[in-house]
């Protein structure tokens, strides 16, 4: 980035052994996931930059709908500010009990269903990162994708991690970091390289037009689509800082 590489560079890792998230949290990135970074140099107003993570989330959602059709259309939601999640109660979603997967069965682009999320009262801390229901139950979704933005060297590095294929033993993680996988949306799954490549290609194809709109006109033209597929629709959200003070 500091050397002046033009925007459009995509760097991909097959796995990461020293990944980390916000606040230095360690992050496991085994083979079977999509881990990539995009170099962008958008000439936009500074106030628009935080919405770039939502644009990327919309691209991830569009990509999965293109690959998995109606199943993704109904189940995949964008969680502000930087996640894409899978609704656990969606009719088509299959979760840890569905362990036998062999050949990638992705369909053509799905039909627009426009189904609204079931309303639930949630409380979210630290930019919506930690959420629980009023009665202490876990949120009704699992994490498919995480997105990061880092401004550096006159550009923005956009990191995208998508859980594509589950490991042999699914991680025992609860709460906001409970994982979901693209394989949960497919009737069957192909070899890891084929599946991950399909997700990468679909993501880049979906991101290009969204990025063009955002770069020219900001987030305003995309608000309606984001609102239609936000995981927090109909929910009460409370934001607190690290010291648990209400923001």
Where are these regions (language model features)?
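N-terminal lobe of the biotin/lipoate ligase/transferase fold
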Residues: 1-75, 89-96, 100-106, 113-115, ...
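Short, low-complexity Ser/Thr-rich regulatory SLiMs
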Residues: 88, 148-153
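Short, acidic (Asp/Glu-rich) active-site segment that either coordinates a divalent metal cofactor
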Residues: 153-186
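Conserved, helical-rich catalytic subdomain that frames metal- and/or nucleotide-binding sites
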Residues: 185-245
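Cytosolic ligand/metal-binding cores
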Residues: 145
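Short beta-strand segments
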Residues: 12-14, 37-39, 79, 148-150, ...
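Glycine- and Gly-Pro-enriched alpha-helical subdomains that act as flexible
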Residues: 80-86
């Amino acid at each position: 980035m500091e050397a002046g590489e033009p925007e459009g560079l995509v760097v991909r890792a097959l796995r990461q052994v020293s990944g980390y998230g916000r606040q230095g949290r360690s992050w496991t990135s085994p083979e079977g996931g999509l881990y990539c970074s995009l170099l962008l140099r958008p000439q936009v107003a500074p106030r628009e930059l935080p919405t770039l993570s939502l644009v990327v989330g919309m691209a991830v959602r569009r990509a999965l709908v293109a690959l998995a059709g109606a199943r993704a259309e109904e189940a995949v939601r964008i969680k502000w500010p930087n996640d894409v999640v899978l609704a656990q109660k969606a009719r088509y979603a299959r979760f840890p009990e569905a362990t036998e997967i062999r050949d990638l069965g992705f369909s053509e682009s799905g039909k627009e269903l426009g189904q609204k999320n079931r309303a639930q009262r949630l409380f979210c801390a630290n930019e919506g990162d930690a959420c629980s229901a009023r009665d202490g139950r876990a949120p009704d979704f699992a994490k498919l994708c995480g997105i990061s933005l880092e401004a550096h060297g006159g550009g923005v590095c956009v990191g995208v991690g998508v859980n594509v294929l589950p490991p042999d033993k699914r991680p025992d993680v609860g709460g906001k970091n409970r994982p979901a996988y693209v394989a949960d949306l497919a009737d069957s799954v192909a070899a890891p390289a084929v599946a991950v490549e399909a997700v990468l290609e679909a993501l880049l194809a979906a991101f290009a037009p969204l990025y063009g709109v955002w770069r020219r006109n900001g987030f305003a033209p995309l608000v309606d689509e984001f609102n239609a597929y936000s995981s927090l629709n109909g929910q009460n959200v409370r934001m607190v800082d690290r010291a648990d003070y209400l923001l």
